[in-house]
Amino acid sequence: MQENLKNDKLKIGKYEFDSRFILGSGKYSLELIKSAIEEAKTQIITLALRRANTGEIANILDYIPKNITLLPNTSGARNADEALRIARLSRELGCGELIKIEVISDSRYLLPDNYETIKACELLAKEGFTPLPYMHADLYAARAMRDAGAAAIMPLAAPIGSNKGLCAKEFIQILLNEIDLPIIVDAGIGSPSQACEAMQMGVSAVMVNTAIAEAKDVALMAKAFSLAVNAGRAAFLAGLASVSKAKASSPLTGFLRD
């Protein structure tokens, strides 16, 4: 089993990673970014392009170690065309071809627009990007995103920033059953135990932002999530026992009347 864990890689398109914990960077002070990355033991960090403005004195890229893979997102895009423009700008800034597609036209609930996200997947894939669409867990939309060129599917667990956990658990399970791409749970994970539960389901990775950024001790919470993700993955690989009725843990033969 130790060998299984050692060789267990997260594969996204042509990329491979040892860590299955993706760290968001949207709510941290710049001073806390580096310590959170170190304690999270992550290899991927998401990045809103507005925080990577190379014309500013305080640039988040200066606080992210060079060995970390950047996953820029299209935050702020309201449709597929806007997502494409942001992705192009990201590539011009040297952020690479991995891109998390975020298309949100609803400012109240901040739910992803699956229809525009499908269109964005197709547009970005045609331009050589490796798209990872953030989406509402829906099988038909996930199939369309896969067919449009998505390298992974990133369903929300609960509304972004809500910390409510796996509200969409049953729908995520359907994606796990039917979609032959990495399923990365994104948004709504509020505690290490929820991240562990998601990994136990068999998702490929978990992304967390708010629950760490708003913790009293950011670095320690990042470490807690990292341990939880690893524990959940190990439990999934080990094979969780599942029974439908009571089963004694000790033999009952020769006991009392027998």
Swiss-Prot record:
It comes from the Bacteria. 1-deoxy-D-xylulose 5-phosphate binds at residues 161, 187-188, 209-210. It is an enzyme of class 2 (transferase). This is Thiazole synthase. HAMAP family: ThiG. PANTHER family: THIAZOLE SYNTHASE. GO terms for cellular component: cytoplasm. GO terms for molecular function: thiazole synthase activity. The lineage of its organism: Bacteria, Pseudomonadati, Campylobacterota, Epsilonproteobacteria, Campylobacterales. Belongs to the ThiG family. Gene3D superfamilies: Aldolase class I. Its main location: cytoplasm. CDD domains: ThiG (cd04728). InterPro entries: Aldolase_TIM, Thiazole_synthase_ThiG, ThiG. It comes from Campylobacter jejuni subsp. jejuni serotype O:6 (strain 81116 / NCTC 11828). It is found in: Cytoplasm. One of its GO terms (biological process) is thiamine diphosphate biosynthetic process. Pathway: Cofactor biosynthesis; thiamine diphosphate biosynthesis. Its EC number is 2.8.1.10.
